[in-house]
Amino acid sequence: MFEYPQGYELIAGVDEVGRGPLVGAVVTAAVILDPNNPIEGLADSKKLSEKKRLALAEEIKEKALAWALGRAEANEIDEINILQASLLAMTRAVKSLKIQPHFVLVDGNKIPKDLAIPAQAVVKGDNLVAEISAASILAKVARDQEMEELDKQYPEYAFAQHKGYPTKLHLEKLAELGALPQHRRSFAPVKKALEQF
C-alpha cells in the first residue's frame, strides 16, 4: 500500500509515455483527482485494453479537478537525452495545470529539478497511486492518437501498429525506407538508418 504524504490537500500525479519509441515526442500528463468524485478501475495504462483506456481517459477528463498534458519533441530528446526530456515534459505538464498542486507524485525514481513544488518519486507509481495511473492513461491515449495521425501521413511505416516502438516491423521499415524528420536521431537504430541513406 502506498502512503500519501500528510498535510497536502491538492496532490498531482505525473507520468510519461514514450521513452522507448524511435519516433515522436515523449508525452506526459499531470492529474489532480477529485476525492469526492472517484473513478473506478484506474490502473497502469499498459495493463488496460485500448477500449478501457479510452473510456477511462474521458472519465478522468470529466471528473478530475485538473489535468494537463506536457511533451518534449524528438529534437529536444536528441539534444538533452530521453531522461532529461521526460523530466522536462513532466514539468511542462505540471505547470500547465489550471490549479497548482501542493504536492506532486512522480512515477519512477527521479523528480524533475525545476518543479518548484514539493515532490516524491514513486517506483511503480502507475500501479500504486491513482493519480499516477490516471496520468499514465491520459498520456498513453494522447501519444497513441499522435501515432495514428503519423500513420495517416506515412502509412508505409505502420505507426498505428507499433506506435513507434523498435519492433521488428518498425526496424525493417527504417532499413527499407529511411528515417523521417519525426524520428529521434540520437537513438541507435535511427542513427544506423541515417548512415545507410
Curated annotation (Swiss-Prot):
Binding site for a divalent metal cation: 15-16, 107
UniProt protein name: Ribonuclease HII
GO molecular function: manganese ion binding; RNA binding; RNA-DNA hybrid ribonuclease activity
GO BP terms in the entry: DNA replication, removal of RNA primer; mismatch repair
Enzyme class: hydrolase
Gene for this chain: rnhB
Its biological purpose: Endonuclease that specifically degrades the RNA of RNA-DNA hybrids.
NCBIfam families: PRK00015.1-1, PRK00015.1-3, PRK00015.1-4
